[in-house]
Amino acid sequence: MKYSILTLFPNIIKSYISESIIKKALEREKIELEIIDIRDFTTLPHNQVDEYQFGGGRGMVLMCDPVVSAIESVKTENSIVVLTSPQGKTWNQNLAKSFATEYNHIIIVCGHYEGFDERILKYIDVEISIGDYVLTGGELPSLIMLDSITRILPGVINTESHEQESFENNLLDYPVYTKPHDYRGDKVPEVLLSGHHANIQKWRDEQQLISTFNKRPDLIDESKLNKIQIQLLENLRKSKGDK
């Protein structure tokens, strides 16, 4: 997998990839990553890349030429060009999976200022949002995409870790505990200390469903439940009065 991140603030990206799982993926040559400074593609004095908007209004707008030139400098026939934008599709685990399996080169353009010149969208394949809130720029969304896609790629983390993570089956993760067994009277569930693997797995399956039902019920309909979870879901709905 190759990533090209187009940004006005390359040091933000460099700082993140010097740590964490991305650093390991780079060292193991599981991914390639290039950081493109959009300012390198302006022909204006003082590396200017933004201008006031036509028609008046607050905020500066990124101009077409530096952004489009930066895209064209790295784009190939097999690339997908992503713009981080509050107007885009909301990023989730299913999108991360599809990007990880369907594309070999992902170009991420980080948004900034009041926005982009609308004509830039002609050079964009998909707009992605990470939520309905305002950020200073697109660097954080780009890193979220980078991290969530990369950890899915073969050889980056082990298969068991994937299977146990939240959202892998559209369910939240089960509770986890470590030492001490008793912390201020709050004890670890005895089943986890029993050594009985079947009972432990049953408990974890149940807890996944209970957690999702209570915290993110919107995920339930998209999940693949086993027989125990289906029965438990029926009981949970009955106790809540759902039909």
Swiss-Prot record:
It is an enzyme of class 2 (transferase). It catalyses: guanosine(37) in tRNA + S-adenosyl-L-methionine = N(1)-methylguanosine(37) in tRNA + S-adenosyl-L-homocysteine + H(+). Keywords: Cytoplasm, Methyltransferase, S-adenosyl-L-methionine, Transferase, tRNA processing. It holds the Pfam family tRNA_m1G_MT. The keyword Heme does not apply. S-adenosyl-L-methionine binds at G111, I130, G131, D132, Y133, V134, L135. InterPro entries: Alpha/beta_knot_MTases, tRNA_m1G_MeTrfase_C_sf, tRNA_m1G_MeTrfase_TrmD, tRNA_m1G_MTases_N, tRNA_MeTrfase_TRMD/TRM10. One of its GO terms (cellular component) is cytosol. Signal peptide: none annotated. GO terms for molecular function: tRNA (guanine(37)-N1)-methyltransferase activity. GO terms for biological process: tRNA N1-guanine methylation. Its main location: cytoplasm. Homodimer. Belongs to the RNA methyltransferase TrmD family. Specifically methylates guanosine-37 in various tRNAs. HAMAP family: TrmD. This is tRNA (guanine-N(1)-)-methyltransferase. The lineage of its organism: Bacteria, Bacillati, Mycoplasmatota, Mollicutes, Entomoplasmatales.
